[in-house]
Regions:
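Non-heme Fe(II)-dependent double-stranded beta-helix
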Residues: 1-13, 19-112, 118-119
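Histidine-centered catalytic micro-motifs
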Residues: 109-117, 143-144, 205-208, 224-227
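Short, surface-exposed loop/helix-turn segments at secondary-structure junctions
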Residues: 112-114, 173-184, 213-218, 237-242
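Short, charged/polar surface micro-motifs in flexible loops or helix N-caps
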Residues: 79, 89, 104-107, 133-137, ...
Length: 270
């Protein structure tokens, strides 16, 4: 499924689009899982709908221990192999499952950001982004090509109001004003159909393409974050203390490789 050319493209650009890579069985389980979570939200359910808005923008993460549908996807689908092959890893752990729902009419979406500053992991990581409905370019994601190779971490913006978190440390710089200087960057985006997926590096800058416009139809996306064999747990600071404390309570040691039942090993070369 994954050619050498695709691996080279992923390593160079920080993102690839895989066509017809996810069988319908796994997509159906994802839809069922989201429906279940919406009826019975868990500890990590978040509602970023602006005050007074009638259309919701919600998401939830680390749902799989209470959602058998997501556990099945994580343990038995080809996602782990896809992630491991593109990252050129010896083995991979699934570090977080996550779904998003942006209802028709919702006028907010993810601003320019990359994932690493939101999470307590360092090393080689990727995200597999899976649309559960067809997504034209304007309803998908836009990426800054090659931005994962800039060697820079950016302050994490909070999604609901696009207000930066207080990220301690000189290594975190403000996200550049990409829209105002678009001529300085090369952008990548795709129209994606059911069964397609996007795979991107933890440091690749991206945003929801039509984040400043109302969604024309309801959008459901499921994402899975994977860490390669060099990934370690590294608590970042106060803005991630809820999740880092949660993982430490489950036995994950700071500065150590992933070793926690919540983040299972899902694929290995041998």
């Amino acid at each position: 499924m994954i050619s050498e050319d695709l691996v080279e493209t992923y390593q160079r650009d920080g993102v690839v689009c895989l066509r017809d890579a996810i069988p319908e069985k796994w997509l159906a389980l994802g839809r069922e899982g989201i429906d279940q979570n919406l009826k019975n939200p868990g500890r990590f359910f978040r509602d970023h709908t602006p005050t007074g808005a009638s259309s919701r923008y919600v998401f939830e993460y680390w749902t799989w221990p209470q959602t058998p549908q997501f556990e099945d996807v994580i343990r038995n689908s080809p996602l782990g192999e896809i992630a491991g092959t593109l990252m050129q890893a010896n083995h991979v752990h699934m570090v977080m499952d996550n779904w998003f729902m942006r209802e028709a009419g919702a006028s907010n979406g993810a601003p320019w950001h990359h994932d690493e500053p939101y999470f307590d992991f360092e090393g080689t990581l990727c995200i597999i982004w899976i649309p559960l409905e067809r997504a034209p370019i304007e309803d998908g994601l836009t990426f800054v090509r090659g931005s994962h190779r800039w060697g820079q971490l950016y302050v994490a913006p909070e999604f609901s109001e696009n207000v930066p978190f207080v990220c301690e440390g000189s290594q975190y710089q403000p996200v550049p004003d990409i829209d105002a200087h678009s001529e300085d960057y090369e952008f990548l985006s795709w129209e994606v159909d059911v069964g397609d997926c996007l795979v991107f590096d933890f440091r690749t800058l991206h945003c929801v393409t039509n984040r400043d416009q109302s969604a024309q139809q309801s959008q459901r996306r499921m994402t899975f974050r994977f860490g390669a064999d060099d990934t370690v747990f590294s608590p970042r600071g106060r803005w991630t203390e809820e999740t880092s404390a949660y993982l430490m309570g489950l036995g994950q040691k700071p500065g150590s490789p992933i070793d926690c039942d919540l983040m299972p090993k899902v694929w290995a070369t041998a």
